Curated annotation (Swiss-Prot):
The keyword Repressor does not apply. Keywords: ANK repeat, Plasmid, Repeat. ANK repeats lie at residues 73-102, 106-134, 140-175, 179-205. This is Putative ankyrin repeat protein RF_p42/RF_pd42. The lineage of its organism: Bacteria, Pseudomonadati, Pseudomonadota, Alphaproteobacteria, Rickettsiales. GO terms for biological process: RNA processing. The keyword Transferase does not apply.
Amino acid sequence: MHHLIDQLKSKNNIFYIRALVPMIVLCVLLISKTVYGYDTKLEHLCKAISNNNIDLVKQAQQKSQYNQRCIQERETPLILAISNNNIKVVQMLLDFGVDIEQEGRYGGAALYNAICHDTNIVKLLIKHGANINKRLSEGSRETPLIKATKCFENGSIANTEHIKILLKYGADINAKDVNGITALKMAEMQNDQSAINLLRSSGKK
């Protein structure tokens, strides 16, 4: 390899660069396969999910494809479907047996990533056994409940509907993030009275 590069350098820089391109592409693919588990079938699956193409999602052959990260989005297929608010694909992946606790690119599992999205997806994930209190493995180390206090949706800071659901299924109201902030404290910091009242009525004084 080094001998070939030296020969190319000595002849012409343009030819040298052109000859290096395939080598660079090959190296990138090899690294991608090692780091992200890249394969063509996986990328077709990820593209199908991004395009909400349910028929193509159904064609995925190997279970392992569902538990790898997509190259372009750097997310798992399940979290990608959640981000697209595509409950049909989420249901399909869960029925197939995808790892519901697998973390995405920022350290959050499926439920954490769903908290500021479709309520029906949140309910579906809980129904399939998602860990209510699973924290981010990186950064703030916050729980889904803490995240629900700052979704900034529909003119409100907190997603009170999701707070209710999480509390109903046993979310730890006293859980703190890396800075020692609870869900109630976060709601108070943002002066979101609806979330404050809801959390206080659930037993936090």
